[in-house]
Amino acid sequence: MKFFKFIFLVFSTSIVAQNQTVGVFQYNENTYEGYTLFSPSRNTYLIDNCGRLIHEWASNYRPGLSVYLLEDGSLLRTNKITDLNVFQGGGIGGGMEILDWEGNVIWSYSYNSTTFHQHHDVEPLPNGNILVLAWELKTAEEAILLGRDPNLLEDNELWPEHIIEIEPVGSNEAN
């Protein structure tokens, strides 16, 4: 009897072991064909619809909240840079980098200081420039002159949005 229990255990284990343990567990016929690009950590992954790894890039930085695969196969990735500790907000980033297909950093740029900080997203443009979404420090006086209700100011400052267009130059500069 022990022998039959053993045989049953071996066969049932082998059947369970055949279930998928890695990748996509549900595939819907209405799923768009293509790839998924995501950066959950210092690494960025490109996977197919079955969850198979197509490519991977490594970074020295924690991720910001956006990543783009560019037409030439390079990767535009936002980075979380919090070394200034001036402003802490949801979606804080502070930097961006472009990596080639082999993972070499070909351009890296920080857009953060005590008066401005990149956050959430960037947008690569067809001309090679990048739109950058950022917060910009306004003093209470500046904010009130621009129409802010003084009763709604916290810490006597305001961090409104601004968007700039930058042109990557060299390996770590921008116009």
Question: Could you say what each language-model-derived stretch is?
Answer:
Residues 18-175:
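Histidine-/acidic-rich catalytic cores in large beta-rich domains
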Residues 1-20:
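Bacterial Sec-dependent N-terminal signal peptides
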